[in-house]
A protein has these predicted regions:
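Catalytic center-proximal scaffold of phosphoryl-transfer enzymes
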Residues: 2-11, 21-22, 28-32, 139-141, ...
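Short, flexible loop/hinge motifs at secondary-structure junctions
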Residues: 1-157, 232
Length: 453
């Protein structure tokens, strides 16, 4: 009887053991699935919230609804601060007199003319007036087969859209990212129906302008390889639902935009050639490596990465690492503001190099700081202090990023382009507009001159 109890006890223990083993295996499998799902979620979240996420996109930046209602922040200067008025214009187009009534509107007292003083103020106004021009056009069918048509400097030789209207269409399209339908409605509204062109007609007008500007666009592209340096950046750009990329380059004289179906090195090679004699100011995207004579890597990206990790791990010495980099960057930026001589630049570069190496060679950084050192500071060693030595360039790529930001509105509002031709037209026209602004000119007036000539 006793033997049977022992066997039964062993059997129960074996059953219990198998139950707990199966339960552990099931829990281990569930844990593995949860951890795997967590990693996928973290990877997906990191695509939207990382060191390159603009501050305007951070969800924790915005206050709650209750806090927003309690603490409104109106635009402009705070009440009681010094006013800021425009200076008097150099010329005026019209002069008017604002006259007083015979009596005070409040108490009815008679106002004597000899007691009245005057003052000047300036009012800025604008009108959009439709101008319909009747053109009496001479023509002559020559015996040689040529059909000769008379010309006028203020009138396009073909079409019904004048030069000013074409330039306005372009400004509304590119400056405000307006749809062709909205541009058509806008002109129909402000001109009381006198100017009413279909969206297709406006689209065709933009295409003709791009075609006219294409030779000078190609000329700017050919000039890039002869420039001493170029700021470079790229961003995603949908074309017919496919992922293309908008590349933007800023040099001393030009801004150049190209939209390609590639983010690879070949785009740079096609523009600058295999051995570019100048320098590239960019982020640490690897396609920029080993094709230019010198580089300046972007300190804004470096500091943003360090700050992101410091906020993520506030108890680690990544915080100290970020503070050291920020202090060094501020010191270098202040030095460049003084417009130093070449000799002083060479001397200070050695000093700043020692300070950067001291940060790099510190042995007790946490793994997050070491990761930045290994993958950023050491990999691109020699590319962080070029701006100290070479005059005219900055420590970061913010100059180019501010230019490329002008195209983001188009991408967000219009979703990129539906055709390759539309993408090419955008690159051509926007290259000229940004180049004119870069040169201190007004894009509307410059485009008007190009169309007339």
């Amino acid at each position: 009887m006793r033997k049977i109890n022992i066997f039964e006890e062993l059997k129960r223990e074996r059953i219990d053991k198998e139950f707990y083993i199966n339960k552990c295996n099931a829990l281990e499998k569930q844990l593995f699935e949860v951890v795997n799902e967590l990693r996928k979620t973290q990877a997906l979240l990191r695509q939207f919230l990382n060191e390159n996420t603009p501050s305007s996109k951070l969800p924790f930046k915005y206050p709650s609804k209750e806090q927003s209602e309690k603490e409104p922040k109106p635009r402009g200067k705070p009440p009681g601060s010094n006013g800021g008025n425009k200076e008097a214009p150099e010329s005026v187009d019209r002069k008017v007199k604002a006259k007083l009534e015979e009596r005070c509107p409040r108490c009815g007292k008679v106002i004597r003319r000899r007691d009245i003083d005057t003052r000047l103020r300036y009012v800025y106004d604008a009108i959009m007036k439709a101008i319909i021009i009747e053109v009496e056009e001479e023509f002559y069918p020559c015996d040689c087969g040529e059909f000769c048509i008379g010309t006028h400097p203020d009138i396009p030789q073909r079409g019904m859209m004048g030069y000013g209207l074409q330039a306005l269409f372009t400004e509304l399209k590119f400056n405000f990212s307006g749809s062709y339908a909205n541009i058509s409605k806008f002109f129909d509204n402000v001109t009381n129906g006198k100017i009413n062109f279909s969206p297709k007609a406006i689209n065709d007008c933009i295409g003709r302008i791009a075609h006219k500007l294409e030779p000078s666009y190609d000329k700017i592209e050919n000039e890039l390889k002869n420039q001493d340096y170029a700021y470079s950046d790229e961003t995603s750009w949908p074309v017919n639902g496919m992922q293309w990329y908008l590349w933007l380059f800023v040099t001393t004289n030009f801004v150049f935009i190209t939209i390609q179906n590639s983010r690879a090195r070949r785009v740079l090679i096609e523009i600058f050639g295999e051995d570019y004699h100048g320098g590239i100011i960019s982020d640490c995207f690897k396609v920029y490596d080993n094709f230019a004579k010198w580089y300046q890597k972007c300190w804004a990206h470096l500091l943003r990465k360090a700050k992101f990790e410091a906020e993520k791990y506030p108890k680690k010495n990544i915080v100290k690492f970020y503070e050291n980099l920020k202090h060094l960057h501020k010191e270098m930026a202040n030095f460049l503001k003084e417009n130093p001589s070449k000799e002083l630049r060479t001397e200070k570069k050695i000093e700043f190099e020692k300070k950067l190496n001291k940060i790099i060679n510190y042995k007790y950084w946490c793994k997050e700081a070491k990761s930045i050192i290994d993958n950023w500071l050491i990999v691109y060693r020699g590319h962080w202090l070029t701006a100290i030595e070479i005059e005219g360039i900055s420590l970061d790529n913010n100059f180019c990023e501010r230019k490329i930001r002008g195209s983001i509105g188009w991408r967000k509002m219009l979703g990129g382009h539906r055709t390759k031709e539309g993408a090419k037209q955008y690159a051509i026209i926007q290259t000229h507009r940004e180049t004119w602004k870069h040169q201190g000119k007004y894009p509307y007036n410059e485009l008007l001159n190009v169309l007339k000539n």
